[in-house]
């Protein structure tokens, strides 16, 4: 399927649509309206119609969207038939939680290897995932052809580890550290800062109290 260039905001919403369509399909529903989708995924219906418009005519005016057809389409767009192996770098408290989770509700993503400096866990299998020593990082990432990694190392090691991952061919990094990483233009970094997100939530709640 030809790659379609879409806005980043649209790309982030596609998995939301796909997950809800899975639910509808399991319930045996044949069609869904943009209004129903809007209420379920908390995205306004105008944005949904605009998102879908990037892919051509996916629905019919007055009818809505065929659930099976839409599900099949987004399955291809999101590569749901292709298994993506992801590396976890750093097996501390957050890393262990991610290992235990390991995208169990996803059919196409899995953490296939993990790395840490702790000799008590390296060389072992945790939650079904082999944990390697950080000294083996570049070799294993290259040998296993891993292109996506989750980074949960201490801040002091974040940039150094990133440089090693990039050298090994990693092209996508989900960064859970508070450090803003420096990476080549062809490497995409997605920052996940839980503390910042919570602080933002607290700010908005406090603002609503004042009003």
Curated annotation (Swiss-Prot):
UniProt keyword Flavoprotein present: no
PANTHER family documented for this protein: REDOX-SENSING TRANSCRIPTIONAL REPRESSOR REX, REDOX-SENSING TRANSCRIPTIONAL REPRESSOR REX 1
Name of the protein described by the UniProt record: Redox-sensing transcriptional repressor Rex
Keywords per UniProt: Cytoplasm, DNA-binding, NAD, Repressor, Transcription, Transcription regulation
Classification lineage: Bacteria, Bacillati, Bacillota, Bacilli, Lactobacillales
Organism encoding this protein: Lactobacillus acidophilus (strain ATCC 700396 / NCK56 / N2 / NCFM)
Any GO BP: negative regulation of DNA-templated transcription
Job of this protein: Modulates transcription in response to changes in cellular NADH/NAD(+) redox state.
DNA bind region: 16-55
Protein's cellular compartments: Cytoplasm
Binding positions for NAD(+) per the UniProt entry: 90-95
């Amino acid at each position: 399927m030809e790659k379609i260039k879409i806005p980043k905001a649209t790309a982030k919403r596609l998995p939301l649509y796909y997950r809800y369509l899975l639910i509808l399909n399991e319930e045996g529903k044949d069609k869904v309206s943009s209004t129903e989708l809007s209420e379920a995924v908390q995205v306004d219906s105008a944005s949904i119609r605009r998102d879908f418009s990037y892919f051509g005519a996916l629905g019919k005016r007055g009818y809505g969207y065929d659930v099976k057809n839409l599900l099949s389409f987004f399955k291809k767009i999101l590569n749901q038939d292709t298994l993506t192996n992801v590396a976890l770098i750093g097996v501390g408290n957050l890393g262990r939680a991610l290992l235990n989770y390991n995208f169990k509700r996803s059919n196409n993503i899995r953490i296939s290897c993990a790395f840490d400096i702790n000799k008590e866990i390296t060389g072992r299998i945790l939650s079904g995932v082999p944990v390697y020593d950080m000294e083996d990082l570049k070799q294993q990432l290259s040998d296993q052809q891993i292109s996506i990694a989750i980074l949960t190392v201490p801040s002091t090691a974040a940039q150094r580890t990133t440089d090693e991952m990039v050298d090994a061919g990693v092209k996508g990094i989900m960064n859970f550290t508070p450090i803003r990483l420096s990476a080549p233009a062809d490497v995409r970094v997605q920052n996940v800062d839980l503390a910042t997100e919570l602080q933002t939530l607290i700010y908005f709640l406090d603002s609503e109290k004042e009003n």
